[in-house]
């Protein structure tokens, strides 16, 4: 460890600032889900056409995570964070100014570049910066920042977009990032790269069947979730025939349930992670199958969203903990791969939802999403039986 001993208060401040950064990065990835209709209206496009922006963003992150991580593997981490935040902020200013849809997509690609690097180093940085014996809590704090992006970031971003225009949402995120950057500059010491891995560690990781199986499970289950979730805002308004305000409330409920999922996993994850993930995937299958039937009332959709939010948070946390446990010798490479694979799933799900909405009916997004969700459930049960001991390992 190259960090000088510091007080627990300062150590926690560093981790909290990193968690706030995680909140901001996740908010900007997810916030277009709540703004699709507004963006489409301003550029005179169909909502589903604008939705392709979600796929482009996610796939840029997927493709660039590993190359960027390797390119920056020897770079001092504090300096790297400053550079990626500058790119992140500048790209949000361009989003605010975007004079056509193409410029907006270009700005989102810039944000995706910053995102790709950020998520490949965040988990390992949180572990390094945490007070002694508090590594698991530090990771949990980063996960909470991620959860809050769905609980608060996405709905608040949508409310700001409704009342002040979607451009203001992106500008506000950029300003939040600027404040966070100033805090990081003030708080962080120099952080030489360590345990970053290199291309040499790739064959080693790919020779771990339990890890590869987790990656496959991740892409399939994330595709299932985002097939429906990417278009939940227009689904609520156009299929269920409910108000724009209720769409905001529903996003708030779904995100808030994620906090419950985080608490459940924090309580039971150490001993029963594999079982929890399988149960959560089964719950996701049920939620997707019931999405259209639940569209007959606000109450039914609200109840469904609670279970959906709990399920996806448990799945996400379970996958991340397992990846870190199975690759303690190359955390940055393993997490860069995980981030890339997760985003392949986001992009694939958003694209499937896009095609279903354009060429079939938006009402079918739940049923179509349930197909890969069922496949994921079978795969989750199979791998938990094949590697029951390995998959229960936890990072120490």
Curated annotation (Swiss-Prot):
Record membrane topology: Multi-pass membrane protein
Keywords carried by this UniProt record: Cell inner membrane, Cell membrane, Membrane, Sugar transport, Transmembrane, Transmembrane helix, Transport
Gene Ontology cellular-component terms listed: plasma membrane
Molecular function terms from GO: carbohydrate transmembrane transporter activity
Sequence intervals crossing the membrane: 15-35, 50-70, 81-101, 103-123, 136-156, 169-189, 209-229, 246-266, 275-295, 301-321, 333-353, 363-383
SUPFAM superfamilies assigned: MFS general substrate transporter
Subcellular location: Cell inner membrane
Family: Belongs to the major facilitator superfamily. SotB (TC 2.A.1.2) family.
NCBIfam families, sorted: PRK03545.1
Main function: Involved in the efflux of sugars. The physiological role may be the reduction of the intracellular concentration of toxic sugars or sugar metabolites.
Protein name, as recorded: Probable sugar efflux transporter
Organism name: Salmonella newport (strain SL254)
